[in-house]
Amino acid sequence: MSAAPGGKFKLSGLETTADDHDAVEQATAYIDDIIQRIRDISNNLMPGTLVRKGVLYAIEEYIDGLSKNEALKISFVHQGVPELDKAKAINIYRLVMEIIHNTLKHAKAGFLDIEFKREQDMLILTTQDNGSGFDYETMKLNNSGLGLRSMLNRAEVMEGDMYVESSPGKGTKYIIEIPIT
């Protein structure tokens, strides 16, 4: 076995059957798929666009990529948002990703409107979907919903507040207020 370019290994000199060859091909395809998934996850956690061009462009790029593959119509408008420090930009990006992910996975919504604006010394991120909604108070009492807890923690880390308006059958609205400091 010797390393080939790209980090793959050649099984030269070994006697193999057709079944062995098929198994190696399947394993190679599986490993290639895992590598691609890791790259995708890594890119979603910290996309190069976020570092190079900022949070607004990174969100727009993510939404553009989704619109080609998902039935969900996403609208993103922003107004007066200043350049943000890296930590705040990452947290806001991940908040938006979690909201989009939850909308796709749970809400069965047709649209998701995202608005991000500056009001005096606050950044206001507001999202609204027309999905199935959920009982927010019950989820809070039961301490369920890992994504929701993650979102609350991110808002708290930025010394912000997150408000949720949702009920079964009525869609979900998130309002996240973050001080500009």
Residue spans for each PLM region:
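Conserved short strand/loop->alpha-helix "switch" segment adjacent to the catalytic nucleotide/phosphoryl-transfer site
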Residues: M1, K73-M97
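Short alpha-helical "switch" segments that flank and position catalytic residues
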Residues: M1-D20, H101-R118
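Short beta-to-alpha transition helix within the HATPase_c
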Residues: E25-D32, Q36, T49-E70
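Conserved transmitter core of two-component histidine kinases
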Residues: L66, L72-Q79, L84, I124, ...
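Conserved polar catalytic motif of the HATPase_c/GHKL fold
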Residues: R94-N102, H106, S150
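A short beta-strand-to-loop micro-motif at the C-terminal edge of the catalytic HATPase_c
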Residues: K117, E165-G171, E177-P179
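Acidic ATP/Mg2+-coordinating residue in the GHKL
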Residues: D129
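ATP phosphate-binding glycine-rich loop and adjacent ATP-lid/helix-beta elements
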Residues: T138-K170
